[in-house]
A protein has these predicted regions:
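Ferredoxin-reductase
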Residues: 2-89
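FNR/FR-type flavoprotein reductase catalytic core
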Residues: 79-223
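Structural signal for conserved beta-strand scaffold positions within catalytic alpha/beta enzyme cores
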Residues: 16, 64, 161-163, 218, ...
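A charged, well-structured terminal subsegment
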Residues: 174, 255-265
Length: 265
């Protein structure tokens, strides 16, 4: 995993908001410093209201970078996310970023990348695909949700869909779909898996990757109040890299991307 060092605390301006369905919105804002330094897997912490409510900033994966503009995907779950999703062009926001580490697209050597995501977990995958394509990697998306309303494929290519209710694509979950696909994919050359989504999905994927001997990195989600290691709101328990015992980690500092083998299943 690659770590980010060029962090800025910036005032930015929203240039557009667009509903993508399923209570998810695409928000674009201008912030040259963050756009210049963003890597796949990084996130930003955003405060939209200049008052003290909501008190904590909200973390969002960086979805895409276009020139000086940064795009995020946000799901309206009330509070700060509602303010952001309903904001109009010209709204001023406060943004810290880029934060966290990034997906490692260099090692171990691989020719095909499988990007597994669930629901809003597709958020970081567009920027990741762009960087992988620049390195001439084959990219396959495996995307899951409860129904077609949970599926978001904006900017993504070569997508394989799984829905639990069968309203789109394969009927079942992403692990079942991946299990059906993986044999043929592995025949084409070395594979590395990258993932973001609900914790149960990530834990199941960690087990599957271990079973198949696949290198796998996952982006974890938790509460991140400050994003810079001060509030200690994002502590997670992971296996030690040695494989023996566990230890606590500040996800905003040493994550959100971790090796899947460290997840406690």
């Amino acid at each position: 995993m690659h770590h980010q060092s060029e962090i800025t605390d910036s005032k930015a301006t929203i240039i557009s908001t667009r509903n993508l369905g399923g209570e998810v919105s695409l928000i674009a804002f201008t912030c040259p410093d963050i756009a210049r330094n963003a890597l796949p897997g990084n996130f930003v912490n955003i405060k939209i209201n200049p008052s003290n409510q909501p008190l904590l900033r909200r973390p969002f994966s960086i979805h895409n970078v276009d020139g000086d503009n940064v795009e995020i995907m946000a799901k309206n779950i009330g509070g700060g996310t509602a303010l952001l999703c309903n904001a109009s062009a010209g709204t001023a926001i406060e943004v810290i970023g880029p934060l966290g580490n990034a997906f490692n697209i260099e090692t171990p050597a691989f020719s095909t990348a499988i990007l597994v995501s669930g629901g809003i977990g597709t958020a970081p995958m567009m920027l990741l695909e762009k960087h992988l394509k620049a390195e001439e990697k084959e990219v396959i998306h495996v995307i899951g949700g409860r129904s077609r309303d949970d599926i978001h494929t904006r900017g993504l290519n070569n997508c394989h869909i799984a829905t639990e209710d069968g309203t789109e694509g394969f009927k079942g979950n992403v692990i079942e779909l991946l299990r059906n696909m993986i044999g043929d994919v592995m025949l084409e050359g070395p594979v590395k898996v990258f993932a973001c989504g609900p914790n149960p999905m990530l834990k199941a994927l960690a087990g599957f990757s271990q079973e198949r001997g696949l290198s796998c990195e996952v982006s974890l989600e938790t509460i991140m109040g400050c994003g810079i290691g001060i509030c200690y709101g994002c502590i997670v328990e992971l296996k030690n890299q040695s494989g023996e015992g566990t230890s606590s980690m500040l996800l905003c500092q040493d994550g959100p991307v971790v090796d899947a083998s460290r997840l406690i299943i």
